[in-house]
Amino acid sequence: MMQLNAGHSAPPGAWFDGAGVNFTLFSAHAEKVELCLFDESGNETRYALPARSGDVWHGYLPGARPGLRYGYRVHGPWNPAQGHRFNPAKLLLDPCARGVEGDVIDDPRLYGGIDTPDPRDNRDAMPKSVVMDDRYDWEDDAPPNIAWGETVIYEAHVRGLTRLHPDIPPALRGTYAALGHPAMIAWFQRLGITALELQPVAKFCSEPRLQRLGLANYWGYNPLALWAIETRYASQPAPQAALNEFRDAVKALHKAGIEVILDVVLNHSAELDLEGPTFSLRGIDNRSYYWIQDDGDYHNWTGCGNTLNLSHPAVVDYAIGCLKFWVEQCHVDGFRFDLATVMGRTPEFRQDAPLFEAMRRDRSLSAVKLIVEPWDIGPGGYQVGNYPPPFAEWNDRFRDDMRRFWLRSELDVGEVATRVAASADVYRRNGREPWACVNLVTAHDGFTLRDCVSFNGKHNEANGEDNRDGAWENHSNNHGYEGLGGGQSVQDARRASTHALLASLLLSQGTPMLLAGDEQGHSQHGNNNAYCQDNELTWFDWSQADEGLVAYTAALIRLRRQIPALTASRWWEENDGNVRWLNAAGAPMRPEEWHSGTRQLQILLSDRWLVTLNGRDEVSEIVLPEGEWRAVPPFAGEDNPVVMAVWHGPAHGVCVFRKS
């Protein structure tokens, strides 16, 4: 039997140094930690970690190699009222494991107990941590380092984007390899996007409730092991092969000049509430990892049963180590943080929260793009506009106001102008720049763009909750017919609204984020919460792509790059050459016009580009300002000879002109 020596208290997790493996595990309240190793037949051998430095338990196993499967059993007090739920009958995943073998199938042995510890051994039902080999040939890979002002984000799901792509070999569809395939690279370049933002690719599992309904967690916001690659998206599902396949995709995307941003769920874990399974953190040090109420229950500020305590020094270290792994070992270019108010809780939200300060101090993390979803469901959870530099934020005000203007006729141009100007009322503070405003009209969470113009209500019956889940208010408009059908007049109106929303997104100051599939006309048939639909409802049907809409979207992105006012990282000032606001007569907007109910606006950008908006329900005449103006693609041909002085704007229409 091999013997462990003391080893070292860092780095976190299991690290192969060429001669053996160093194991570390944080637990402030444990009394004993056993390292459990598994051979090819599943036989378990246990070793007590021989050393403790502060609250880190550690040991070194000479001769151990990558591919070794392991877990932990952690001994300590069972005192639920104090937040302690140690149960050595439960094999636990290493929170810092960079590989996990096996998937979670709901099994009663996975539950640690509520009032008393469950004595059943979960070994045969529990996925295993895997020692990984971090050596990888990155060749001459370098980050594209796209300036924020030039950034156009494309939010996508690994499987949904590529599962039905006809030009990708069947064995690679729905995988990391597909992302780096020449067919996908060509698609990204055709659109002109600069950053691929991927929904979670860290190891996750399906909630027990979904499994019992015969459904699966598709989106991935139920994290099991945040440092480990999700193997279900790999063409070769062994953890090491999956990790290297992901790295291959990143390398290929970088060669094409495309950044990779990962959606990360640093707010809760798959252990859910007190009735949920015990996989890792609950059994390792429940009181340290989670926000615990006075009675020992969890603060549920995420809506998922538990909330990570990211003000605890050890949990901050855990989060920082996780992010650094993805940047330094996988070369990702940034992160989008789900329910990110949790990251700043102390428990009150603070701009100088420990995790934020640690991220700003870290050389690797301060050099990548950091984007937050600036809310959670806890007290004071809505924090839009309140994040410190260098964070950018999803701007739900842009999403809602643009939908309300174009689809519901509920706003006038004053509010629209504010959103076009990078929502300066929200973000122009604390030294932040316009790129901190991430504009979106749709995201994975909610209606697709096509569904926004095709459905008044959500249709989530397939989710198994009798349509109770998902947002009730979507600021959508079916244009007179509920569903994808309808006559030609309905389709024409929908097309106009779609074009207007895309133009608003891509021709506004700030960082635009396009939901993958919106450029194709992808529909989820009214499901605005398709988190559990891993099927044709969410997979893109490339054979049905709306080529006209694809061309329109790509042309808007090309147009955006030509307009300095949209790509410069400085706030607009009246008459500074960046922007002038004009009325339908081509004259400067008067103060009383902004909120007078008018729904027409002209925006002169960089003294040469004129964006005209007609939010009325009928064709309206808009007089262009003095000069020779020609409409530009996608609103006219490349060599448009027609000089216009008046634009007869169609209902809910947009056009862009260039001054000769």
From Swiss-Prot:
Pfam families tied to this protein? Alpha-amylase, CBM_48, GlgX_C
Q: Which UniProt keywords apply?
A: Carbohydrate metabolism, Glycogen metabolism, Glycosidase, Hydrolase
SMART domains from the xrefs?
Aamy
Q: Which family does it belong to?
A: Belongs to the glycosyl hydrolase 13 family.
Pathway annotation from the record:
Glycan degradation; glycogen degradation
Its recorded reaction(s) are: Hydrolysis of (1->6)-alpha-D-glucosidic linkages to branches with degrees of polymerization of three or four glucose residues in limit dextrin
- The catalytic residues are 338 (nucleophile), 373 (proton donor)
Q: Which residues carry the site feature described as Transition state stabilizer?
A: 445
Which residue ranges does the record annotate as region Disordered? 460-482
Q: Which GO terms describe its molecular function?
A: glycogen debranching enzyme activity; hydrolase activity, hydrolyzing O-glycosyl compounds
Instruction: Please give the name of this protein.
Output: Glycogen debranching enzyme
Is the keyword Acetylation in the record? no
Function summary: Removes maltotriose and maltotetraose chains that are attached by 1,6-alpha-linkage to the limit dextrin main chain, generating a debranched limit dextrin.
For bias type Basic and acidic residues, the affected ranges are 460-472
Which organism was this protein described from? Cronobacter sakazakii (strain ATCC BAA-894)
EC assignment: the record states 3.2.1.196
A single BP term in Gene Ontology = glycogen catabolic process
